[in-house]
Amino acid sequence: MTRSAKKGPFCDAHLLKKVEVASSGKDKKPIKTWSRRSTILPEFIGLTIAVHNGRQHVPVYVTENMVGHKLGEFAITRTFKGHAADKKAKR
């Protein structure tokens, strides 16, 4: 089920504080966050946010098309190594 429209988008308070500081200054360092559940807001456009994927922080540059999505959608958590090769096909 989706979130109720009357509640508005969710974003962690500590992330909003970091975004306000980064957007007011001219610092281009990525903002580190573990908050994959936060919704991308219009204030995030043009910033680079390093989203944790369980192992490392993946840098995500926020564009206009990403507004409304969650940060976790852009930091993939699973690595696909490929299916096992078929031994019969190799012969």
Curated annotation (Swiss-Prot):
Q: Does the keyword Ribonucleoprotein apply?
A: yes
What InterPro entries does the record tag this protein with?
Ribosomal_uS19 (IPR002222), Ribosomal_uS19_bac-type (IPR005732), Ribosomal_uS19_CS (IPR020934), Ribosomal_uS19_SF (IPR023575)
Which BP terms from GO are recorded? ribosomal small subunit assembly; translation
Keyword annotations for this protein, in alphabetical order, are: Ribonucleoprotein, Ribosomal protein, RNA-binding, rRNA-binding
What Gene Ontology cellular-component terms does the record carry? Answer: cytoplasm; small ribosomal subunit
Q: Name one GO molecular function term.
A: rRNA binding
Task: Establish whether keyword Ribonucleoprotein is in the entry.
Answer: yes
Q: Which residues form a coiled coil?
A: none
Task performed by this protein: Protein S19 forms a complex with S13 that binds strongly to the 16S ribosomal RNA.
The entry sums up its family as follows: Belongs to the universal ribosomal protein uS19 family.
* NCBIfam families named in the record: rpsS_bact (TIGR01050)
The protein's name: Small ribosomal subunit protein uS19
Name the gene behind this protein: rpsS
